[in-house]
From Swiss-Prot:
Distribution of this protein across tissues and organs: Detected in liver (at protein level).
General function of this protein: Component of the 20S core proteasome complex involved in the proteolytic degradation of most intracellular proteins. This complex plays numerous essential roles within the cell by associating with different regulatory particles. Associated with two 19S regulatory particles, forms the 26S proteasome and thus participates in the ATP-dependent degradation of ubiquitinated proteins.
Keyword Acetylation: yes
Protein name in the entry: Proteasome subunit alpha type-3
Gene: Psma3
Key words, A-Z: Acetylation, Cytoplasm, Nucleus, Phosphoprotein, Proteasome
Length: 255
């Protein structure tokens, strides 16, 4: 509620006296309470990594994925309410399909990001609807445009990034991403770093078990968005665990 007055958070169409739209801020809180997702753009593609929390031992492995194929050349990573994210993934797929039907070639990622951002923004304007409780990243690679990465938040704002993080540990993840020389790295290099960052920011006290989801799109995949092969993912996880172990040992030595 507003510090100036109450009742300004009942509708997305109402501003508070200090110029805030509380329903949009609450939607962003839903994203901040979600597991972490990161996207990194490098010289030959884009890599996504998601910390998918396992809330029950009864879940089937691989269920409730947070990485989606939007089009052959576009991938999507989400944080926030999964049902809202699935709905937006369907909207993005429809936009990509309609563009190809009308113009005969793949939709440029900036155009797709702008179109979906407009749709998300429309849900912040009316009292009859609520804002989407998720943020998501879109990544693609083409010979003409190279690697591209965009993030859209619940307010409908879209930005292009070299590296981006969303979810509960986004600040810690961004700090780690900033240490990387992304413009000089390849997808194979970045996959290991993405896995390492997810393991670093994972809160073992509050959230015990999690599955690491990794996907990429780039020269290596011939411009197609694909899940990272199991052997490469396992290699990346091994690298992440060894790096964490080395850091813990060096911290113990310094004490």
């Amino acid at each position: 509620m507003s510090s100036i007055g109450t009742g300004y958070d009942l509708s997305a169409s109402t501003f508070s006296p200090d110029g805030r739209v509380f329903q949009v801020e609450y939607a962003m809180k839903a994203v901040e309470n979600s597991s972490t997702a990161i996207g990194i753009r490098c010289k030959d593609g884009v890599v996504f990594g998601v910390e998918k929390l396992v809330l029950s031992k009864l879940y089937e492995e691989g269920s409730n994925k947070r990485l989606f194929n939007v089009d052959r050349h576009v991938g999507m990573a989400v944080a926030g309410l999964l049902a809202d994210a699935r709905s937006l993934a369907d909207i993005a797929r429809e936009e990509a399909s309609n563009f190809r039907s009308n113009f005969g070639y793949n939709i440029p990622l900036k155009h797709l990001a702008d179109r979906v951002a407009m749709y998300v923004h429309a849900y912040t304007l009316y009292s009859a609807v609520r804002p989407f409780g998720c943020s998501f990243m879109l990544g693609s690679y083409s010979a003409n445009d190279g690697a591209q990465l965009y993030m859209i938040d619940p307010s409908g704002v879209s930005y292009g990034y070299w590296g981006c993080a969303i979810g509960k540990a986004r600040q810690a993840a961004k700090t780690e991403i900033e240490k990387l020389q992304m413009k000089e790295m390849t997808c194979r290099d970045v996959v290991k770093e993405v896995a390492k960052i997810i393991y670093i920011v994972h809160d073992e006290v509050k959230d015990k078990a999690f599955e690491l989801e990794l996907s990429w799109v780039g020269e290596l995949t011939k411009g197609r968005h694909e899940i990272v092969p199991k052997d490469i993912r396992e290699e990346a996880e091994k690298y992440a665990k060894e790096s964490l172990k080395e850091e813990d040992e060096s911290d113990d030595d310094n004490m």
